[in-house]
Amino acid sequence: MHHFFKGQFFDFETCRILGTAVYGGADVAEVLEAVGQIRDGDPVSWGRAWAIQAERALVLAEEACKSGDRTAARDAYLRGSNYTRASGYMLTGEGPNRPDPRSREIVERVQAIFRKAAALFDHPVQFLKIPFEGGLKLPCTLYLPPPDRRLPGKIPILISGGGADALQEELYYMHPSAGPDLGYAVLTFEGPGQGVMLRKHDAKMRPDWEAVAGAVIDFLEELARSQPDLDLDTSRIAFSGCSLGGYFALRAAADPRVKACVSLDPLYSFWDFAMEHVSPTFINAWEAGWLKDGAVDAVVRMMMAMSFQMRWELSIAGTFFGQTSPARIMKEMKKFSLAGGQLRRVQCPVLVSGASHSLYLEGNHHTMRIYNELVNHTKGDKQLWLTATPGQGSLQAKMGALRLANQKTFKFLDEHFGIERPQL
């Protein structure tokens, strides 16, 4: 596979942006131009390069609006939104739980630009709020199929959730970009620790995502009752997610109202993920009490000073966990696990995938452990999708292979929701 950068981190994140081109989130030459302006491992040049492309895309969007070119305007707004997201992606602030104040401004700008694009979509889109604990309201977007793409009967629903760092607007390039044309309603949302909920409301991430998912499903059921003209089928609700979002999807799938689950390249345990980046001897000494938290913090901060990727990872994790100490961040990670029989609670059909070239997760540990612990399933009710090359989906979260991920996802849902399509 060709690489844009020698460093895996910037290379993967570039593939992540370029991969959205199939659904309008990028243009190849714009990406190549940005790459040429970025120094590997330098977050400042990264942010500047994508900000330039964002502004250029927005100029094109306004020109297209003035000339009445709906498609060009929509696509340019999509690119402007996605490049704006990318421009703020590498911001680390002053360290864990000390975010850059620009992060909130960028997230809100991404949202505003994306809504301009959504107003030009060929299918209905609703921007809604989900009531949640403590008076919070989770932002969500409901993408509905156009009338000519409706399936017989009521509309099946896919809830597509984010993970550690994706914004709701980026989630569009996964399932919402394909689902409505296949007759599905797709709902995306941001929960505690994600997107605007983190940057604007300082709502921290929580491991018991079934509580979050339950509120989302409650909202959908009430929406279906109060707006029967939407024709939503709450007896056919699926839940999906990628990476940490795949973990969240499996937690959500314990709710009996979830009738199918798609977990793409999930993690089994956040702690296990972290331990792949740290010496086992060092961690064992800490857990045995031979090293204090302060010593761990000092060593990890030295590592952060030498590696931008580690600095970014711990800064992001510390912010969504609400912790400044590396030792406390790692302790928080222990709470995010599917161990202890969690997967025994899942009764619905599950599609779970792995990524052999993952930047973060070792598939044989995470994916296969999840698959093997889905003990309440017959072979037909749990499907395993392992990939060998990037074109087949071997990059984490199926980056660069979004069309393939959608094809696999909706084929699986069709099978378990009783949807039959005529051969072409």
UniProtKB/Swiss-Prot annotation:
Checking PANTHER family in the record gives: ALPHA_BETA HYDROLASE PSOB (PTHR22946:SF13), DIENELACTONE HYDROLASE DOMAIN-CONTAINING PROTEIN-RELATED (PTHR22946)
Which Pfam families does the UniProt record give?
Answer: Abhydrolase_6
Classification via Gene3D superfamilies:
acylaminoacyl peptidase, alpha/beta hydrolase
Question: Looking at the record's lineage, which domain of life comes first?
Answer: Eukaryota
What turns on expression? Expressed exclusively during fungal penetration of host leaves, the time point at which plant defense reactions are triggered.
| EC numbers for this chain | 3.7.1.-
Q: How does it assemble?
A: Homodimer.
Q: What is this protein called?
A: Hydrolase ORFZ
Molecular-function GO term, any one? hydrolase activity
SUPFAM superfamilies, A to Z: alpha/beta-Hydrolases (SSF53474)
Family named by the database record: Belongs to the AB hydrolase superfamily. FUS2 hydrolase family.
So what does this one do? Hydrolyase; part of the gene cluster that mediates the biosynthesis of a tyrosine-derived cytochalasan acting as a fungal signal recognized by resistant rice plants and leads to avirulence in Pi33 resistant rice cultivars. The first step in the pathway is catalyzed by the hybrid PKS-NRPS ACE1, assisted by the enoyl reductase RAP1, that are responsible for fusion of the tyrosine precursor and the polyketide backbone.
| Keywords, sorted A to Z | Hydrolase
Residues of the active site = 243
Please tell me the species this chain comes from.
Pyricularia oryzae (strain 70-15 / ATCC MYA-4617 / FGSC 8958)
**Pathway, according to UniProt?**
Secondary metabolite biosynthesis
